[in-house]
């Protein structure tokens, strides 16, 4: 009786662990962070030129892509022409447009 109860408990734990690991929507943020390029952690860089171009950067602290004003030259890698490029490269979503 005790042995069958122990076996049943172990089987249930294994089943629950398997279900939890294979559940869609399970937190994969650590995997995304591991695959994110290092330049996604850099702050936005306007550059020395005076143009006023709207670009996107990945805000690592907030966890999403935001806009910033780019001067037009000497861009760094965390500088994207579209929100889609930013999200594809660094992950996250499109954030508020407060920086315009």
UniProtKB/Swiss-Prot annotation:
Prosegment location in residue numbers: 22-33, 100
CDD domains: Kunitz_BPTI (cd22592)
Coiled-coil stretches: none
Domain BPTI/Kunitz inhibitor: 40-90
Disulphide-bridged cysteine pairs: 40-90, 49-73, 65-86
Positions of transmembrane segments: none
Signal sequence segment: 1-21
Subcellular localization, as worded in the UniProt entry: Secreted
GO cellular component: extracellular space
Site residues by UniProt (Reactive bond): 50-51
Main location group: secreted
Keywords: Disulfide bond, Protease inhibitor, Secreted, Serine protease inhibitor, Signal
Molecular function per GO: serine-type endopeptidase inhibitor activity
Cited PANTHER family: KUNITZ-TYPE PROTEASE INHIBITOR-RELATED (PTHR10083), SPLEEN TRYPSIN INHIBITOR I (PTHR10083:SF367)
Protein name: Spleen trypsin inhibitor I
């Amino acid at each position: 009786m005790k042995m069958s109860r122990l076996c049943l408990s172990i089987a249930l734990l294994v089943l629950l662990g398997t279900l939890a690991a294979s559940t869609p929507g399970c937190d994969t943020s650590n995997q995304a962070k591991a695959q994110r390029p290092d330049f996604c952690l850099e702050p936005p860089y306007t550059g020395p030129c005076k143009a006023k171009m709207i670009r996107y950067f990945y805000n690592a602290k907030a966890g999403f892509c935001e806009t910033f004003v780019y001067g037009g030259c000497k861009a760094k890698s965390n500088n994207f022409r579209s929100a889609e490029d930013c999200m594809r490269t660094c992950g996250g979503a499109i954030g508020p447009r407060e920086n315009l």
